[in-house]
Amino acid sequence: MTTFIQNPTQQLQLRKLTGRIGAEISGIHLSSELDSSTVQFIHDALLEHKVLFFRGQQHLGDTEQEKFAELFGSPVKHPTVPAADGTDFIFELDSQKGARANSWHTDVTFVDAYPKISILRGLIIPETGGDTTWANTETAYEDLPELLKQFAEQLVAVHSNEYDYGGPKQNVEPEQLERLKKVFVSTKYETEHPVVIVHPETGKKSLLLGHFFKRLVGFSQSDSQLLFNILQEKVTRPENTVRWQWQEGDVVIWDNRSTQHYAVNDYGDQHRVVRRITLAGEVTTGAHGLKGKTTLPKDLSAEQLEKAKLHAVLNAN
């Protein structure tokens, strides 16, 4: 189904890509100069479709990507990885530097107020391969049997940046992976999140899992993994997913509070570079009001704590 939206400056077309997640918007030139009605349309479409795809945005450079992102919230840096050279907030994923995630995850869930929105721009795209798949974590929750919903709502999971990027990867030299991991876990983070969270804007429930997951509070590692596998499998079922074949100049925006994604590492030694900006989110809230809580790092100095508090205030929405 294609929806046409008219405004004084451009005619937008929105086309759903699957029954449960994803829509492509065309007829738009992304920039920081978008009028308020267009920004509102994109925001509302994002809440409904979870992931929005835009072709042909080659004009969008690093600076303009950062300015465009500010229309939807406050950009935040990655907690451990420095911003790309010449930028304030951009997180670069370069396959030649070992950045091949190749796992299902929600961005930066190892902190309590993880990003609400991610905006990804394709710079160098392989001729073949290198797609990204997104999954709808709200419909995954909705598909659970009632008793399993009730059980999941009682669970609390520990998320850590020691996980996900620490796993084995194809087409990545061990030395590259070790360098990447050292940067990624230069400060160790652990955060406890409810497994079922409530979206702060829509009020809908979803499953917060992905491969930053470490264990469930109160369960052994083996039992944690068994329960994780049961719930994670619901997220990644084909009917909950959309797969995007990248072209250079594409921009993808997703609601990081109701999705997981997976960058497919199937492009061998071809070069792939994408650049991401994330927007400040809120501390998670569970189905029964429990809040997310960061438990590590604990060894921050008083000065570091004050800086962290100031950073949180400056980036609050």
Curated annotation (Swiss-Prot):
Enzyme Commission number(s) of this protein: 1.14.11.-
Pfam families per the UniProt record, alphabetical: TauD (PF02668)
Positions with a binding annotation for substrate: 78, 108
Entry keywords, A to Z: Dioxygenase, Iron, Metal-binding, Oxidoreductase
Binding site residues for 2-oxoglutarate: 132, 272, 276
Molecular function GO terms recorded: 2-oxoglutarate-dependent dioxygenase activity; metal ion binding
Annotated binding of Fe cation, by residue: 105, 107, 261
SUPFAM superfamilies: Clavaminate synthase-like
The protein's required cofactors: Fe(2+)
One CC-aspect GO term: cytoplasm
Subunit structure: Homotetramer.
Known role: Alpha-ketoglutarate-dependent dioxygenase that in vitro catalyzes the oxygenolytic release of sulfite from hexylsulfate.
Protein's recorded name: Alkylsulfatase
